[in-house]
From Swiss-Prot:
Stretches of the chain forming a coiled coil according to its record: none
Gene: nadE
Function: Catalyzes the ATP-dependent amidation of deamido-NAD to form NAD. Uses ammonia as a nitrogen source.
GO molecular function: ATP binding; glutaminase activity; metal ion binding; NAD+ synthase (glutamine-hydrolyzing) activity; NAD+ synthase activity
EC number, as in UniProt: 6.3.1.5
UniProt record similarity statement: Belongs to the NAD synthetase family.
Residues engaged in binding deamido-NAD(+): R112
Pfam families associated with the record: NAD_synthase (PF02540)
This protein's name: NH(3)-dependent NAD(+) synthetase
Record InterPro entries: NAD/GMP_synthase (IPR022310), NAD_synthase (IPR003694), NH(3)-dep_NAD(+)_synth (IPR022926), Rossmann-like_a/b/a_fold (IPR014729)
Catalytic activity: deamido-NAD(+) + NH4(+) + ATP = AMP + diphosphate + NAD(+) + H(+)
């Protein structure tokens, strides 16, 4: 198993280097939240680009203090250059103007603010924006369109969350980050498990079977329950996948009009 993950690390580092070169970039930038996914991406980027891999820390007015602490600790441990841009003043303005905004609206606004800061830094420093969303999030649509899902390339987008955990172990990610509950940190008390209803240890095996069995076919509830999955779990996951499938699609462009 260790040998497989060492090969994966080499593969992902090679991906980052080649894809950046292909696009004409020598520097990269990514958002570092203090969570697992961005920590893994940060360490991979540091291995490839050294001082040319830059992390942006972008806490909001509701970010947990330990998120910033964990991000700073990672930067110190792995010698990662970083800049902090607080988005708190901006999300406070949004909250004051839209007092009835739901937590989801506020969270999406913060995610898109961070995207704006990343792409502004990208332009200023001639750096390529690196994504940090894992495959579980992408399949479930558990992310903000044109927010945390926005990037130029993504080294972990084909790794399920449970696989990211395993990779993080071999990258020597600090235990504090490894052991804390996954959270987008978009509002107080948020956690992935609360939002999704299940831990990734339960969700990922189902997602893998869905991918293996229904790549080009409609997903069938009965097939999955016959494999032993709980019916409510399967219904919830299928509903989320179908509802959010558009987030993985490129914008649909009308075909060129040719008058007869």
């Amino acid at each position: 198993m260790q040998k497989d993950y060492q090969k994966l690390i080499v593969y992902l580092c090679d991906f980052l280097e080649k894809e950046a070169q292909k696009r004409g970039f020598k520097k990269v930038v990514y958002g570092l939240s203090g969570g697992l996914d961005s920590a893994v991406v940060g360490v991979l980027c540091q291995k490839v680009f050294k001082e040319n891999a830059h992390a942006l820390l972008m806490p909001s007015s509701v970010s947990m203090p330990e998120s910033k602490t964990d991000a700073l600790n990672l930067c110190e441990t792995f010698s990662i250059p970083y800049t902090e841009y607080s988005i708190a003043p901006y999300d406070k303005i949004f909250g004051s103007h839209f007092k009835d905004a739901s937590l989801t609206r506020k969270g999406n606004f913060c995610a898109r603010l961070r995207m704006a800061f990343l792409y502004d830094y990208s332009l200023k420093s001639d750096s390529l924006v690196i994504g940090t969303s894992n495959k579980s999030e992408r399949i479930l649509g558990y992310g903000t369109l044109f927010g945390d899902l926005a990037c130029a390339i993504n080294p972990i987008g084909e790794l399920f969350k449970t696989e990211v955990y395993e990779l993080a172990y071999y990258l020597n990610i600090p235990k504090k980050i490894l052991n804390k509950p996954p959270s987008a940190d978009l509002f107080v008390g948020q956690s992935d498990e609360k939002d999704l209803g299940y831990p990734y240890s339960v969700i990922d095996p189902l997602l893998k079977d869905i991918e293996a069995l229904f790549q080009t076919k409609p997903i069938h509830l009965e097939t999955l329950t016959q494999l032993g999955y709980d019916e409510i779990l399967v219904k919830n996951i299928i509903s989320r996948i179908q509802k959010n499938a558009f987030k993985l699609e490129s914008p649909t462009i009308a075909k060129r009009f040719n008058p007869k």
